[in-house]
Amino acid sequence: MYYSSGNYEAFARPKKPEGVDHKSAYIVGSGLAALTAACYLVRDGQMKGEHVHVFEKEALPGGACDGYKYSIGYVMRGGREMDNHFEVMWDLLHSIPSLETEGASVLDEYYWLNKEDPNFSLCRATVEQGKDAHTDGKFGLSDKGAMEIMKLFFTPDEQLQDKKITDFFDDEVLNSNFWLYWRTMFAFENWHSALEMKLYIKRYIHHIGGLPDFTALRFTRYNQYESIILPMIEYLKGFGVQFHYDTKVTDVKFDIQGSRKMASSVTVEHAGEVSNIDLTENDLLFITNGGCVESCTVGAQDKAAGFDPTIKPGNGWDLWKKIAAQDPSFGHPEKFCSDPELSNWESATITTLDDKIPQYIQKICKRDPFSGHTVTGGIVTVKDSSWLLSWTLNRQQQFRDQPKDQLCVWVYGLFSDKPGDYVKKPMRDCTGKEICMEWLYHIGVPTDQIEELAEHSANTVPVMMPYIDTFFMPRAMGDRPDIVPEGAVNFAFLGQFAETKRDTIFTTEYSMRTGMEAVYTLLNVDRGVPEVWGSTYDVRDLLNATVKLRDGKKITDMDLPLIPRLALKEALKKIEGTDLEKILKEYNAI
């Protein structure tokens, strides 16, 4: 497996890998990484679809990419913010046919939609029950705060092992608009990994200027289950890929001889029956280790979701622990799943049932929420919320079968253990109705109407996810296994807890990249995997981000000590009349 960039490799079709007709594949899980691996097995690996088996412990595919209507109401555990430089994602989705538009791909549909209806927010944050917080597109960083971010940016990864964000940032950053935007957009907490924070800054340096108003983002038409997962499932079914639902993989055994490592058997449980599948070198095993939505609990309008982080037999953490015990190169799951109090948050899907609540939404987002176009344009954060509540409406309807006179609002709170401001209970102890009441309070509904509207004008389903942020926990090299560990003969790891270079976790792209790299490595597919977009090496993006992060202030306006200030003045004299001066002026750096 090797990396590439540019159109030459992107448009090429690889030859059929040698011996692939004699190989089979077993995939543990059916999340985005697993489905991506299956797609690349049949598309570029040209493996027979009937030789590919997907084991999913739930009754439906998709993993964390959900979006369902249950008897208790619509449920979206989360949403995905996409980027124009998700190179692997677009490499695959241009091959996946749309389910709605004949002759178009999922990428075509997505591209047209976001061209015609570009995303941007008109209100990023509120205070005092629905008033605009007037962040006004500013990061609000002092020079000291900007230097703290710069220091982290240039710190080698080796020095960031097991370090927390608070090891680098103090209140100069943590009390700024920058941190408000960042933590609520990406779900970072102060105690999370400084290494991952650095990787995020470098990965999305080209989007720094688009963070305050979300012009950096793109979204699918519907929830990601309907917009991404279902088209992938139909594509795979067309090849004859075998899906095994309600089927747990409870153990994997490895034959390790010196540096050679081979997956030798898989233990599978279905309908109470346990069976073992013996593997040979021609049987490829793709393992989704860990999982951000494991042990999640779902509440209802009149039921709290609760908080139960118990790791049960057959879930992703249990399986990874069994695997990790067999070899040090298989990672250290305990680094991620040992303290769910530091990795949880709770979300809720609020469905409006009449015309009473939408007026308050429209007052804040300044758009008609029933238009079918961009509504909030990303999350609206309640700056003075004890739960640090954020909420969003993507284009409605979010579900194909959603009534046109209803809206689906997604709400989440980073602090599930803190009492609310109106409902004086922790979010995790609140029913759907009570979470809706807290939200209604913060969007400006008069207090004498809140309970009535939460009861009769909305249906709310909460979901608690104990491990949703666990991949952000401080980590060191080796805590996540390589996608294909050194010496591995017939297996690979997939998903957010498999290690790949330079990319950032908690993204659709990361999951899909692990799937592509796993297949290309094990089948030796002779085509380049598109490298992570290299904006961090582009001087134009670096200059633009530097200026935007300081709210448009030039580097000559920095509050520098005398000696550095004189040195900068002398350096600027030396570049007068050069291309360097020209580009610095073009990007308003001087």
Spell out what each predicted region is.
Residues 72-112:
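Conserved FAD-binding subdomain of flavin-dependent enzymes
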Residues 29-32:
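Glycine-rich Rossmann-fold phosphate-binding loop(s) that bind the pyrophosphate
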Residues 202-284, 288-290, 302-303, 308-317:
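Helical element adjacent to the flavin cofactor pocket in flavoenzyme catalytic cores
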Residues 205-220, 282-284, 289-514, 520-537:
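C-terminal segments that line or cap access tunnels to active or ligand-binding sites in enzymes
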Residues 99-206, 217-219:
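Rossmann-like flavin
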Residues 1-25, 43-51, 545, 549-590:
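Extreme N-terminal leader/targeting segments of oxidoreductases
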Residues 42-69:
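Glycine-rich FAD pyrophosphate-binding loop
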Residues 37-50, 235-241:
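A short, Lys/Arg-enriched amphipathic alpha-helix followed by its capping loop at the start of a domain
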